[in-house]
Swiss-Prot record:
Biochemical pathway: Carotenoid biosynthesis; neoxanthin biosynthesis
Gene behind this protein: NXS
Protein source organism: Solanum tuberosum (Potato)
Protein name, entry field: Neoxanthin synthase, chloroplastic
Family affiliation: Belongs to the lycopene cyclase family.
Biased composition (Polar residues): 22-33
Its job: Involved in the synthesis of neoxanthin, the last product of carotenoid synthesis and a precursor of abscisic acid.
Amino acid sequence: METLLKPLTSLLLSSPTPHRSIFQQNPPSLNPTTKKKSRKCHFRNESSKLFCSFLDLAPISKPESFDVNISLVDPNSGRAQFDVIIIGAGPAGLRLAEHVSKYGIKVCCVDPSPLSMWPNNYGVWVDEFENLGLEDCLDHKWPMTCVHINDHKTKYLGRPYGRVSRKKLKLRLLNSCVENRVKFYKAKVWKVEHEEFESSIVCDDGKKIRGSLVVDASGFASDFIEYDKPRNHGYQIAHGVLVEVDNHPFDLDKMVLMDWRDSHLGNEPYLRVNNAKEPTFLYAMPFDRNLVFLEETSLVSRPVLSYMEVKRRMVARLRHLGIKVRSVIEEEKCVIPMGGPLPRIPQNVMAIGGNSGIVHPSTGYMVARSMALAPVLAEAIVKGLGSTRMIRGSQLYHRVWNGLWPLDRRCIGECYSFGMETLLKLDLKGTRRLFDAFFDLDPKYWQGFLSSRLSVKELAILSLCLFGHGSNLTRLDIVTKCPVPLVRLIGNLAIESL
């Protein structure tokens, strides 16, 4: 995974993470074979032709920038001193800057392109953004969602889903930062240096900026956050496109949360066998009859599933659904490290966003949680930096890290990671059975699980209910595949409680 992320580190340092953290790339061309065809090769060649014609379409959208009069730090000025330096102007970084600065704390946000549009699409449950007062930052809402378990069973969920308007959300956060006198500096951060009560960042242009606290909101590939345990992440990988199509089969009032059907691979035996072991699903947002966002997603795998494999499965699925793409408006590659250990707590650099451990280990969701937890972290920062005691150094680091990750939240995180470890052990049939039982639970539990708002006790109840609602084969999966992750969970909970 380190090899996969390394060429994209610079992009991530400028555009932190999301619900779905995006690496945008133009897919390589594939030349269709010209060998004499057997029946099996015929199907492979037809797939290759479609693969080329669809994935070779260049996205027609162009990078956008915001026309906001942000206050910039003069690169030629002398010593620049702030209370808080935030690395990255993604959703998490700007949300934190907004909330810390409203208390009069001096904040500098460092990003190579702070006025650029975020590249990734974000989907959230509508009630999550309503609870945060951010409902006006949604550009489309669906009153229902659906989950296709297989060709014969579909779950309809009465929980509205929305797509985040990147433009509205970023504009709102930028304007709040401007109003609160946040300063911005256009550069990449190369190094973070520490003294006893002060830290400094060194930028790629040689500029040094000092502050009492450095917060890294630069995304998954950051080198500034330290771990004291092996980073045994699972990985979510997806290929997504916003496309104009001739037509599509989706209901306009329903967002497709997961489509686990594999009938589209009937003529693709080499893909079907792999999908049976490491399944992918379709995530679809239909906006009108000719505009739809489509994403083929591997929920979690270890090691990361081949990106080319994901794209081939998507081509086969769209062909089976009869979806003819006229043009690709936006394209995105999503790679999200999930689960694994939390960063070392405490340490000299604080984190928020993808590198802070707040990604949902079983789903990859994060943007709503970032919006919710940034004010929590801001409060811990303000209590330290804004206090009459002038808390700095190790005491400040301890306060802010434990503000984001108190004991109960760390224990809850271990429980969610247990869910991820269970998913890693399931094939397509096991995954279908699990979600069939999961979405039959009381909405309090499945909704709470997906939104990261259940307590340890509630998660235990959910597990018992899931066992009770599951089929005999689901129970067999739980009994045979969960003991090792369960023992690890109990051990980690014991360590956290010490």
